[in-house]
Swiss-Prot record:
Coiled-coil ranges per UniProt: 48-78
Similarity remark: Belongs to the Mediator complex subunit 11 family.
Localisation: Nucleus
The keyword Nucleotide-binding belongs to this UniProt entry's keyword annotation: no
GO cellular component annotations of the record: mediator complex
Protein name: Mediator of RNA polymerase II transcription subunit 11
Highest taxon above the source species: Eukaryota
Protein purpose: Component of the Mediator complex, a coactivator involved in the regulated transcription of nearly all RNA polymerase II-dependent genes. Mediator functions as a bridge to convey information from gene-specific regulatory proteins to the basal RNA polymerase II transcription machinery. Mediator is recruited to promoters by direct interactions with regulatory proteins and serves as a scaffold for the assembly of a functional pre-initiation complex with RNA polymerase II and the general transcription factors.
InterPro entries reported in the protein's UniProt record: Mediator_Med11
Major localization listed first in the record, in broad terms: nucleus
Organism: Kluyveromyces lactis (strain ATCC 8585 / CBS 2359 / DSM 70799 / NBRC 1267 / NRRL Y-1140 / WM37) (Yeast)
Complex and partners: Component of the Mediator complex.
Pfam families associated with the record: Med11
Amino acid sequence: MSQPEYIRERLDSLAKIDKQLVDVLHRASLTVSSLIDLKKRNEESKPQFQQNAQEFYDDLESATVQLRKEIKLLDENVGTRLLPIQTHKKATGQDNVKLEEQFKLLTKYLGKDQQS
């Protein structure tokens, strides 16, 4: 079963954002590493630290903007392209109950009697 074009686009966009966030973490690691070198009185690493810090902020800004766009698209499409989903924040364990209910219905419709 293929996914609708809209869903595929959203998943591709989220995968791209995920890669950007990995880059942000990598850049943060490089920035901290160059800061440690700088703290050890290695003044030669100052330009490297500045470059890493700038690239960290650039990557973070890009990922944040893309993620906000995806959230906005999600908000705009709830109820039109996507089903409205209402969950209660304190309803943590109800997902297992619902899952078991769905499995029971599925086995009933398939004609299989499953003992739990």
